[in-house]
Amino acid sequence: MQIKDRAVIKIDSVAFGGEGVGRIDNLVTFVPFSAPGDELDIEITQRKKRFLRGRIIRIIKPSPLRVEPLCRYYGNCGGCCYQHIRYDSQLAFKKKQVEDAFRKISKIADPPVADVLASPEIYHYRGKAQYHAEESFRGWKIGFLDVSGGRLVDIEHCDIMEETINCQMRVLRESKKTLYSKNELAIWSDCPAGESGDGKSILRLVKGKSFLVPHDGFFQANLYLTDAMVDTVFRLAALDEINTIVDAY
């Protein structure tokens, strides 16, 4: 198989990072935006000694795990790679990826990996966005890099961001603030439009307690899972109310 050759492939599994995996001429072949059970007509885009990579030309037979992505940029924007797969299957694949890592790296035959905790919301759950920004002859482009990592995809509305982030994006585009002079732009949810700039602390509530987070600091991205994550840590560590823990990053 050479680059630009065509082939038919059956996808068997999902690799870390979301690419589907099958075999062509006994070579492992990675296919972005595919799902286990897919039968695909693909074009070879990369050939290495131990693997191939291809892109989907046509879905001959779709996997029963496939769903229609909500995002209109999906497949072009490099921000997401699982939206075409049912959410329950996404969680199962991610659990298996952790199990495989323990088996291959730590040589643990049967790693005790728990089921992945499902998010109550699978869209509009992220409380922080790290956008790229660049100036063009038509104005400012704000969004994420494409799947190749070489081109900026201008994103008007991101379906995984909490809606107040999308509102801020609209205001910032219209205001043309000097904030865009940077290559990257961080926006947090629940901030007044245009006011989540550098130097401001962000308020976050966890288990009824208030935390002030630096604008350039780290905080758990999923707004709907933070409380459950803290509960899990307390339970597994057998902590009580008199203990102090630190979420260090």
Please report, for each region that a protein language model flagged, where it lies by residue.
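Accessory RNA-recognition modules of RNA-modification enzymes
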Residues: 1-249
